[in-house]
Every structure is written in structure tokens, then in C-alpha cells.
Swiss-Prot record:
GO terms for biological process: regulation of DNA repair. Belongs to the RecX family. InterPro entries: RecX_HTH_1st (IPR053926), RecX_HTH_2nd (IPR053924), RecX_HTH_3rd (IPR053925), Regulatory_RecX (IPR003783), WH-like_DNA-bd_sf (IPR036388). It comes from Streptococcus pneumoniae (strain CGSP14). It is found in: Cytoplasm. Its main location: cytoplasm. This is Regulatory protein RecX.
Amino acid sequence: MKITKLEKKKRLYLMELDGQQTSYITEDTIVRFMLSRDKVISKEELTEIQDFAQFSYGKNLALYHLSFKARTEKEVREYLKKYDIDKNIVSQVIANLKEDKWINDGQYAYAIINTNQLSGDKGPYVLTQKLAQKGISKSTIEENLKEFDFSEVAQRVANKLLKKYEGKLPSRALQDKIIQNLTNKGFSYSDAKIAFDDLDSQVDQETTQELIFKELDKQYSKYARKYEGYELKQRLTQVLARKGYDFSDIASALREYL
């Protein structure tokens, strides 16, 4: 078979054989096989050329995808699937990129965890979920998590939450709110509790009383329409307790309020 045309078409080249059969190949393929117009090639050589062309095309696509930011093996595989590249070729591309250090799931996991350590707010459970979704193996995730102490991250998040809620919630509700937020962000309950206990979060009696009276102003008009006397007192006690106030503080406030 003779190459009768070799014409550039955007990123690929159109190779025509005997004026009929056509294939799209990469520039790397032309260089590797020293292809030119009028060159004669065998069927075996054509198969080899086509296989390498697809490999080269897949690798170029993957490198383009990786040029924007680091990706995991799973992300690159999914990207290449969109271009209908043969599975075996995809595996060859992935192996080649891993060998050349373009893909390294371990380094990817370490970088994500390290960035979170410096400026993020996620605990190990949420990070594990996110990295697993990227296709990183459980063993790789666990191996990298062991390199980090999350107590500083938990403390940083707890301090931010304290600034947000202090003076707005009673002591018990403040503790519940901060610990709940920390566990939602992926910290264990024990780590969240330690972070809260290390806070300087004393809500003084005067602040607690102010908060109770503000809440009573809102709730009294609502319940006074339906209840009175002992029943009203019970309803107000229940609603204040649900909001995190201690029964002793509630009883003291109700004696003054009612």
C-alpha cells in the first residue's frame, strides 16, 4: 500500500492509502514511522501505525486534560472514554503517564489533605469520601491521612464557629452547635469535643439571662394566646429547654418574667 495523501486537519493528519483507505494519525506517529507521501507500507505496518496513532492521540488528550490541574487515574480514564478510545489503549496511556509521573494518586491525595491542613475546614471522614469519589483507593487514602494531625484544623474551625455563635446561644446549645458543625465537616465526635473543650467559651450568667428574656419576648405572645397559668409556664419551659437553656436558668427567668 502506498501513502497517496498526508494532509494536516487541525490537530490530526489525514493519511490516505492508494487513493481510497484513510486514517487519522498524530504528528508523533508521522515522526516515529517516518511517514511521507508515496511511501509504501505493509498491512502489518499499517496496523502498527494505527495502534500507535490511537495511543499517541489518547496520550495527547490526557496531557491536555492534565495541563489545567492534577487529576487522578479515574478522572483521566473517564475523560478518555468520551473520545471512544479502545480500553486497552486507554490502559496503555495510563500506564505511560504513571511511569512519567503525570498521574500519581498518592501525591494527589497528599496535596489535597495538605491544602486542607493549611487553609481548609474538613475532617478526615469528609476528605476520605471526597478522595474515594475521585477513585483513590482506601489504602492510599489511609496511608496519607496518617501523615497529618487534624487537631489544629478542628481547633481552627471551632474558633470560627465560636465567633459566629457566641453571645447568640446559651452554653449547652453553643456546645451542641459547634460539635454538630465539626462532625458534619468530617471530624469524629471525640475530636470535636476536644476542640470545643479547648475553646475559651464561657457564657456568663448575664448574657444567658439576656438571651432567655429575648427568647421569652418572642415565645410569650405565641403561647399566651392559648395557655395561661401553670400550662403556659410548662409550654415556655419546654420551648426554652429545646433551645438549650438549663432548667435552673429557665426557672429563674420565668419567676421574673411571669
